Design a protein with these regions (language model features):
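Alpha-helical bundle regulatory/interaction domains
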Residues: 1-73, 79-81, 85, 100-126, ...
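Short, basic-rich loop-to-helix N-cap that marks the start of a DNA-contacting helix
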Residues: 88-92
């Protein structure tokens, strides 16, 4: 039996980029304006706790231990509701954050790596290479389009 997940990754993902270029009220100056974050509250504590942890840059694998929940059961529940285990969700989340930060910011690689939850440069490089097909520095160069720099802010 193939059950369609109730929540997709794109429904749950929240970008670390919180501001975009826009105009002031008089339309005289270009300023950064806050972007509406599309944070979906599912009402399902298991999903909301995982998304909250990921948004805060924490590893959701710590949640079961802190909550006294069986890790395997929590991960299986995530898989049923989202089509992804907690590890798969965390990996995809980190990859998406890395892609956005590399494309739209000038943050040093070490800072991008930290914001993605990595302390190991080789592990971070493997994630980016596996996801995007190139190294972090190459991705930064190749993914940028004219006008990307300064388009968004954290």
């Amino acid at each position: 039996m193939n059950i369609k997940p109730k929540y997709t990754f794109d429904m749950l993902y929240v970008s670390p980029l919180t501001k975009k270029l826009g105009f002031d009220e008089q339309k005289l100056r270009i300023i950064y304006v806050s972007m509406e974050q599309k944070r979906v509250r599912t009402g399902l504590e298991v999903i909301d706790m995982v998304v909250d942890a990921l948004m805060a840059g924490r590893d959701p694998a710590d949640i079961p231990w802190r909550q006294g929940i069986d890790y395997a059961k929590m991960s299986a529940t995530m898989k049923l509701l989202t089509g992804m285990t907690m590890v798969e969700m965390r990996t995809l989340w980190r990859a998406r954050v890395a892609g956005e930060l590399l494309r739209y910011t000038e943050l040093p690689l070490k800072e991008v790596m930290r914001r993605c939850g990595y302390t190991s440069a080789p592990s971070f490089s493997r994630l980016v290479s596996k996801t995007y097909g190139s190294s972090p520095l190459k991705l930064r160069k190749l993914s940028r389009e004219k006008g990307d720099m300064g388009k968004f802010a954290l």
